[in-house]
Amino acid sequence: MMHFKSGLELTELQNMTVPEDDNVSNDSNDFTEVENGQINSKFISDRESRRSLTNSHLEKRKCDEYIPGTTSLGMSVFNLSNAIMGSGILGLAFALANTGILLFLILLTSVTLLSIYSINLLLICSKETGCMVYEKLGEQVFGTTGKLVIFGATSLQNTGAMLSYLFIVKNELPSAIKSLMGEEDAFSAWYVDGRVLVVMVTFGIILPLCLLKNLGYLGYTSGFSLSCMMFFLIVVIYKKFQTPCMSVEQNSTVSANVTDACTPKYVTFNSKTVYALPTIAFAFVCHPSVLPIYSELKDRSQKKMQMVSNISFFAMFVMYFLTAIFGYLTFYEKVQSDLLHKYQSTGDILILTVRLAVIVAVILTVPVLFFTVRSSLFELAKKTKFHLCRHVLVTIILLIIINLLVIFIPSMKDIFGVVGVTSANMLIFILPSSLYLKITNQDGDKGTQRIWAALFLGLGVLFSLISIPLVIYDWACSSGTDEGH
């Protein structure tokens, strides 16, 4: 997903100063019962319990390093929308084609509402602990294990996003070059091979950007990326009315088959239906960016940030649904997991323009995500001090691994499927609910909320138990030919 910068510094929330409890003071007025020269054990137990409470307040305040936010509500909505928006939008028409309009709308609405609820849980956890960094929140609640799990989930999500962006380069750059050369799609040469081009782009453009110590241009790329995706949506809607369904079925000779192929399906099930929910989940993940955006919000409060998330998710819901429905109604069951790849840019300046804009946007966004993944690795290895040789070596090795994956992964649906059922599920369902349940473990006043959070956690676990085996089963049963190529 498009990630929000927040000054490349993840600030933390400062809670109200915890008032000192007079009962916990070491007053000389405390009365100590002595029996046979020994202090009453009940008193010791009570004293230790109160000291433990004081220590817990001190622990809570470890996260209270606060710089007041300066970002307006409107700009925060824009930043969160940037964080939500990503390559997932290109796979939604494919998800709709394999579920039907009605079922897709139900799934899209459900994931939108559940994502908003998970952010609500995350904000409550942040308020209770005072932490404004996702990883530190995990460490505060679950210790080192929590920190490692959140690092792993966010790194996998960012890696999946990078893979999808580079897959767009692999898919779209050859078509753009052929169009600029005036060649047909059938034209083949080594310099229009997507595998060669993605390696050239990675080590010619992305590597130098990733080697920088800081990314000063980060604030500009997210806005540019969101603008490109909005431009893409406008083109998708426009092309629906410019592309007759008959042209999709160029090889069809039977009009009855064409008529059937051009009829929208409202509910459908097939072997690719399993990818719908992971793709939608992948498209809505923004949780690692929520707390940094919250920390920058002017006059922040949980209610105000919840309003930011509600507006952002509603806007993305509308944008996602429009892209999916118009993309589907243009190509019907012939739509691919990369919607943009289905449009022919030869002789079409509009498609060529949007294709080039999206390519530039994703190329500039990859280093942003790469910085996050590399920083996480250095943090885990406790190698936070800058070292040039290590910096260069790790960067090159990671980019080689990512390129190999992009070259051999057959289609974008596989990326959406794997990341959707693993890290996206963790970040949306499992982690926020687990953190909330742990934090409110001793709070008897939140019984109803804890039941809902437990059901939410169970839903995430169920999602994994059902989706992961089905995705693996589809891989095992898939033929050599793939629609995503």
Swiss-Prot record:
One GO CC term, this protein: neuronal cell body
Membrane topology label: Multi-pass membrane protein
Activity modulation notes: Inhibited by alpha-(methylamino)isobutyric acid (MeAIB). Inhibited by lithium, potassium, choline ions, N-methylglucamine. The pH dependence has an allosteric effect on the transport.
Extracellular topological domain: 98-112, 170-188, 238-273, 332-348, 413-414, 472-485
Disulfide links within the chain: C245-C262
Post-translational modification: N-glycosylation plays an important role in the L-glutamine transport.
Tissue: Specifically expressed in brain and retina (at protein level). Also detected in spleen, small intestine and lung.
Positions carrying Phosphothreonine: T11, T54
Subcellular location: Cell membrane
Phenotype when changing N257Q: Affects N-glycosylation. Abolishes Nglycosylation. Does not affect cell membrane localization. Abolishes L-glutamine transport activity
One example GO MF annotation: L-glutamine transmembrane transporter activity
Glycosylation sites noted in the Swiss-Prot or TrEMBL record: N251, N257
TM region(s), chain numbering: 75-97, 113-133, 149-169, 189-211, 217-237, 274-294, 311-331, 349-369, 392-412, 415-435, 451-471
Effect of N310Q: Does not affect N-glycosylation. Abolishes Nglycosylation. Does not affect cell membrane localization
Catalysed reaction equations from the record: L-glutamine(in) + Na(+)(in) = L-glutamine(out) + Na(+)(out); L-alanine(in) + Na(+)(in) = L-alanine(out) + Na(+)(out); L-histidine(in) + Na(+)(in) = L-histidine(out) + Na(+)(out); L-asparagine(in) + Na(+)(in) = L-asparagine(out) + Na(+)(out)
Gene Ontology BP annotations: amino acid import; female pregnancy; gamma-aminobutyric acid biosynthetic process; glutamine transport; L-glutamine import across plasma membrane; regulation of synaptic plasticity; regulation of synaptic transmission, GABAergic
Residues where Phosphoserine is found: S6, S25, S28, S49, S52, S56
Keywords associated with the record: Amino-acid transport, Cell membrane, Disulfide bond, Glycoprotein, Ion transport, Membrane, Phosphoprotein, Sodium, Sodium transport, Symport, Transmembrane, Transmembrane helix, Transport
Any one Pfam family match given in the protein's UniProt record, by short name: Aa_trans
Cytoplasmic side stretches: 1-74, 134-148, 212-216, 295-310, 370-391, 436-450
Family listed: Belongs to the amino acid/polyamine transporter 2 family.
Primary role: Symporter that cotransports short-chain neutral amino acids and sodium ions from the extraccellular to the intracellular side of the cell membrane. The transport is elctrogenic, pH dependent and driven by the Na(+) electrochemical gradient. Participates in the astroglia-derived glutamine transport into GABAergic interneurons for neurotransmitter GABA de novo synthesis. May also contributes to amino acid transport in placental trophoblast. Regulates synaptic plasticity.
Name used for this protein in its record: Sodium-coupled neutral amino acid symporter 1
Organism (species): Mus musculus (Mouse)
Gene: Slc38a1
